[in-house]
Structure formats: C-alpha cells, structure tokens
C-alpha cells in the first residue's frame, strides 16, 4: 500500500490550507530561514543513504553518465514545460487573487512548486524505494518538509497549492507500481546502490535549497534509471576481472 505517497499528498493539502489562512502571520525572515533548515535536512537525508553504497564505481558512473544524458536531452527544461502545462490546467480552476503578484509572477511561481513537489529527485526516489521495499521513510521525511514548504508558498499563492497534490499522487503512484514490478529482478546490493544514488540527488537538492550551488537536479534523474543495471553489470562482469 502506498502509505508514503498518501501521507505526502495530505501534507501538501494541509500545508496549503494552513498557509492560505494563517501564512500572513509569518515574517519574511522566518520563511527564508526555515527554507535553509529544509535544505540542511535534505542534505542529512542524502548523506545517510549515500552510506549504504556497495559499489562506488557503479554509482559514480551512473550519476555522471545519467546527468550527462539529462543535460543532453534538456530534461530539466522538458520537466518545466510539463509543469507549465499542469499550471495552465490548474489555472483554469483557481486564478490569482493575491495583489502582491502579477499574473506572470503567479504562474511562474506555480510552475516552480509543481516541479518541486511532483518532479524532485527526492520524491521520485522515495516513490520507487517505497514500491520496491515498502520503506516509506523517505517519503514520510519529505512530507514533513513539504508540509511547511506548501504552507510558505500558500502564503502568497493561496489555496491553489493544495491542488498540486493531485498530479503528484498520479506521478508517484505510477512510479510506485512500476517499482513493485521491478523489485523481483533486483538484489540487495542493487537496492543499496540505488538508495545511494538517490542520496546524491537529495544532497544536491539540499545545496539548491540553501542557494549554495544550483545543481541541475532534474537533469540528474536519469541516473536513477541507470544505477541498478550498472550495479548488476559491475558485480557480474567487471568486479570478477579486477578482484
């Protein structure tokens, strides 16, 4: 059962409601500082899972080649375009009622949070791990961050933030059930290398959140596809030759 996905979606809805009704009481400094804490939490989650790595060369190769593929096909731009399409659908139901934003600023911010909630490396990784192993801890930890992130964005955008839970659930459920089908073909070593690869994405996401370095996290997503085949290939063919 996709418990983590359900909890994550509910956290966005609850955060959106709280932010829309009570967000005006939060100071700009509070919003900025709490976002920095979110970044540190993401880094900590990443570091903890990187420690599970069993085949470092396979993980590093997957991250480098996967990111190269993502950059070559402009995956980040395509994800933004997809978010723009979602934004147009959502915008038909809820319009900008906040005078602080122009219509363009409202739509651009909405696209940003659609990408953040629906296409982040942490969410994709957490959904796949949840489907493969039943471990919902990544998504539950992400839910805590998303609760407050949704509240902060809802301070400015209003109730529209709650609606982002709908496309998020659809995307994460597809990943969850696909991972469930793949799991019988995996080994414990492949799973650990996959978790470590996801840890690098969470670490990069943390750096972005604290605005220390703008890593291309969306373009790093193909590494999540490469890592398990690469881990299997490394253990089966390369490791016997070098050991």
Regions found by a protein language model. Give the residues of each.
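Structural signature of hydrophobic alpha-helical transmembrane segments
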Residues: 1-14, 61, 127, 131-144, ...
